C-alpha cells in the first residue's frame, strides 16, 4: 500500500460553511421573525417620529346651551346621586304674607275665615273661626265690641212650634193641648246675643 494521505473530502473542513451560503441554518420548531416591508414607492418612516402621547379621556365637550344633568350652572360637576338639601320650610301654622283679598284671610286647613271689621276700628281685625251656633252658649269674639265672650241665649217661638201645634190639632188634641209644643224650649229657636254690649250675633233655627 501507498503511504500518501487520502484526498480531502468535499464536505470536510475546507468546504465553505452552509451559513455563509444561505444564512443561518433552519432549526426545527423555530421561525424567523417577519419583517414588515413598506410597499414599493413609499418612504420608510423615520425613527424620530414617535406616536402621539396618550391622553386620558376627559369630560365630553357640551354643546352650547346644554347643561349635563350632573353639572351646576357655574360649570362644576356634582357627584352622581347627590341632591341639594331641601330649602327651609315655614313652621306649622305659619302663613306667609300674600296678596289676599280684603275681608278674608287663610284659616287653618285651607279654609277662608270671615273677617268682621266694625266701623271706627280699622286697626282691629277679628277673625271668626267658623263657630257653630246651636242651642247652647258659644265662646266667640263679639263682632261689635271686639271682646272674647260667651254668648247669651234666649228662646223664641219658631216654625217648629207651629208645625207641631198643627200636628196635635190634626191628631184630635183639643182643649189647649195643641199649645204644648209652644211651651217646650227644645222646639224653639235660639237667639245668641253679646252679654257685654247686648248686640245681636246670630239665631239658630230648629226648622228652616
UniProtKB/Swiss-Prot annotation:
<keyword id="KW-0862">Zinc</keyword>
<keyword id="KW-0053">Apoptosis</keyword>
<feature type="binding site">
    <location>
        <position position="145"/>
    </location>
    <ligand>
        <name>Zn(2+)</name>
    </ligand>
</feature>
<feature type="binding site">
    <location>
        <position position="142"/>
    </location>
    <ligand>
        <name>Zn(2+)</name>
    </ligand>
</feature>
<keyword id="KW-0472">Membrane</keyword>
<feature type="binding site">
    <location>
        <position position="197"/>
    </location>
    <ligand>
        <name>Zn(2+)</name>
    </ligand>
</feature>
<keyword id="KW-0967">Endosome</keyword>
<protein>
    <recommendedName>
        <fullName>Cell death-inducing p53-target protein 1</fullName>
    </recommendedName>
</protein>
<feature type="binding site">
    <location>
        <position position="194"/>
    </location>
    <ligand>
        <name>Zn(2+)</name>
    </ligand>
</feature>
<dbReference type="Pfam" id="PF10601">
    <property type="entry name" value="zf-LITAF-like"/>
</dbReference>
<keyword id="KW-0479">Metal-binding</keyword>
<dbReference type="GO" id="GO:0008270">
    <property type="term" value="F:zinc ion binding"/>
</dbReference>
<dbReference type="GO" id="GO:0005634">
    <property type="term" value="C:nucleus"/>
</dbReference>
<dbReference type="InterPro" id="IPR006629">
    <property type="entry name" value="LITAF"/>
</dbReference>
<feature type="domain" description="LITAF">
    <location>
        <begin position="122"/>
        <end position="206"/>
    </location>
</feature>
<comment type="similarity">
    <text>Belongs to the CDIP1/LITAF family.</text>
</comment>
<comment type="function">
    <text>Acts as an important p53/TP53-apoptotic effector. Regulates TNF-alpha-mediated apoptosis in a p53/TP53-dependent manner.</text>
</comment>
<feature type="region of interest" description="Disordered">
    <location>
        <begin position="1"/>
        <end position="70"/>
    </location>
</feature>
<feature type="region of interest" description="Membrane-binding amphipathic helix">
    <location>
        <begin position="164"/>
        <end position="184"/>
    </location>
</feature>
<dbReference type="GO" id="GO:0098574">
    <property type="term" value="C:cytoplasmic side of lysosomal membrane"/>
</dbReference>
<keyword id="KW-0458">Lysosome</keyword>
<feature type="compositionally biased region" description="Pro residues">
    <location>
        <begin position="1"/>
        <end position="13"/>
    </location>
</feature>
<feature type="compositionally biased region" description="Pro residues">
    <location>
        <begin position="50"/>
        <end position="67"/>
    </location>
</feature>
<dbReference type="InterPro" id="IPR037519">
    <property type="entry name" value="LITAF_fam"/>
</dbReference>
<dbReference type="GO" id="GO:0042771">
    <property type="term" value="P:intrinsic apoptotic signaling pathway in response to DNA damage by p53 class mediator"/>
</dbReference>
<dbReference type="GO" id="GO:0098560">
    <property type="term" value="C:cytoplasmic side of late endosome membrane"/>
</dbReference>
